[in-house]
């Protein structure tokens, strides 16, 4: 007789699934998290966004299949308005993973500081406070929250855990070559800034290997910019699309640096984490959410970052590889999945718990 699973989880995935060229951070996370959960005896299944649009049907499936926890995408209709009051049984089993900050910041910049919870975090059972900028995201609802890092804005949510993602889906290698090209990701800064960045780097004779944040309009515009900068003796290689599961060496092999200018509040960034795992140093903006934890070189603006690189600042060592991997992440998620929905919320998990490794924006992740 087959042994019963340790828990049952249901994850929302974009309609494109796992075979789309637009594969990004969310797909990377769900692919490796679900595999590690299954290996540890927790059942993990998926439903597509179009299927989740019918909240009543989703609630019926959760009840019928005895799902312990359902993980919608952060932009799900489950989190719109007062929907959580209409389907309390579903929301009691809902876990919101903050893979981006779109619920709190329309332009994906850092959410504003909270004057209410700056000193004292929100407490379980307390009514949502007047003046709390997270009010519209319903921190008072029965949903559990998983954050990928510890920031001031996470203190507004009483039922929270901090569980960063991992990067050991690529091997621990030392691929850096100080004389190699700079890998440049575009699509997360304004097009005019991307053009200036390209012009300065190619004008200085820097060899580039360019990848794009393909989910964004800026990323698509950057492709056209790069084509205009190819040729005429400029050393610009373009990788329009890649699958990091198999193409990690094609992307980062022999690179001297990974240059990732992003104005977004990155809750996690797989491209940066993967570069560190592969031994390539990262350069990023200093106010990029989780990005600075992976960066060996930071600056406040794209221009200042290019200044530092051209002044020789690119000769830096990569940050240490995170110790924890997907098995560790899955173990933490399994605890969340097994938590009884009706149980009272415990204290917030400390920022360091489960760490050691250390969107749709990468989501806003890679």
From Swiss-Prot:
Reactions this protein catalyses: ribostamycin + UDP-N-acetyl-alpha-D-glucosamine = 2'''-acetyl-6'''-hydroxyneomycin C + UDP + H(+)
Claim: Transferase is one of the keywords in the record: yes
GO molecular function: hexosyltransferase activity
Cofactor: a divalent metal cation
Enzyme Commission designation: 2.4.1.285
Keyword set includes tRNA-binding: no
Annotated stretches, region: Disordered: 342-366
Bias type Low complexity, positions: 342-352
Function: Glycosyltransferase involved in the biosynthesis of neomycin by mediating glycosylation of ribostamycin with UDP-GlcNAc as a sugar donor to generate 2'''-acetyl-6'''-hydroxyneomycin C.
Name of the featured protein: UDP-GlcNAc:ribostamycin N-acetylglucosaminyltransferase
Species this protein is from: Streptomyces fradiae (Streptomyces roseoflavus)
